[in-house]
């Protein structure tokens, strides 16, 4: 008796197989499949991650350039807004990567077509927040340049990209935001946010703040390795 596989399972197995060749950098095979079925880039595995997402996750800029050459206009075939089961798009994954050039390539291409840069996932996390958490200063500035809103807040903690930069101790990013973008980015960072984070994640907060009003903070020599000591600065980071 023949074994019958659900269509969704077949789709998942196919994407897993393609994913393996993307990881190994087998562009020739991918080109052949693309010419047979261009919509292959939007096919998803069981987690909702599309082939285009996996190209971005693995940082295959050669695959990206090939795809962009095949379209008559940005978004003709590739759907950059497709999201996985957690609500993350390809931009969420690119924002976390160290390779800044891949993010610039995608933003420069889809930026012509007004791609939504601030699209949040199901927790309200936008790509610019993801980049701020990882400390990717270049990625944050690129996303803002293409229209991302660094003052947008996530759903659960009410953190902005600026709040995450302060919380994770990325003072280079904090200063860059306040120097380059004269928006109200020098928001308050109240102590209760640290208490909430401590209760939820059972971790010690990485930052000690003595004031709650509109302040920017810079890193000082640590007195305790478990904490980041800070001092008040003015709103321009000086």
Curated annotation (Swiss-Prot):
Q: Return the motif ranges for PxIxITxC motif.
A: 205-212
**Does Transport show up as a keyword for this record?**
no
Keyword DNA repair assigned: no
Description of post-translational modifications: The protein exists in a 28 kDa and a 32 kDa form, probably due to post-translational modifications which are neither phosphorylation, nor sumoylation.
Keywords linked to the UniProt accession: ANK repeat, Early protein, Host cytoplasm, Host nucleus, Host-virus interaction, Inhibition of host NF-kappa-B by virus, Repeat, Ubl conjugation
Q: Where is this motif: FLCV motif?
A: 227-230
Question: Where in the cell does this protein reside?
Answer: Host nucleus; Host cytoplasm
Gene Ontology cellular-component terms for this entry are: host cell cytoplasm; host cell nucleus
> Which is a GO BP term held by this UniProt record?
regulation of gene expression
Instruction: Tell me the Gene3D superfamilies matching this sequence.
Output: Ankyrin repeat-containing domain
What does the record say about induction? Expressed in the early phase of the viral replicative cycle.
Q: Where is this motif: Nuclear localization signal?
A: 80-86, 202-213
| Signal peptide range in chain numbering | none
Query: Can you tell me which family this protein belongs to?
Result: Belongs to the asfivirus A238L family.
Q: What does this protein do?
A: I-kappa-B- (IkB)-like protein that inhibits the binding of NF-kappa-B to DNA, thereby down-regulating pro-inflammatory cytokine production. Forms a heterodimer with the NF-kappa-B subunit RELA/p65 and prevents the activation of the NF-kappa-B transcription factor. Also inhibits the host calcineurin phosphatase activity, which is required for the induction of nuclear factor of activated T cells(NFAT)-dependent immune response genes. Inhibits calcineurin function, which is required for the induction of nuclear factor of activated T cells (NFAT)-dependent immune response genes.
Subunit: Interacts with host PPIA. Interacts with host PPP3CA/Calcineurin. Interacts with host RELA/p65; interaction of the 32 kDa form with host RELA results in the formation of a stable complex with NF-kappa-B. Interacts with host PPP3R1. Interacts with host EP300; this interaction inhibits the association of host EP300 with host RELA, JUN and NFATC2.
Name of protein: IkB-like protein
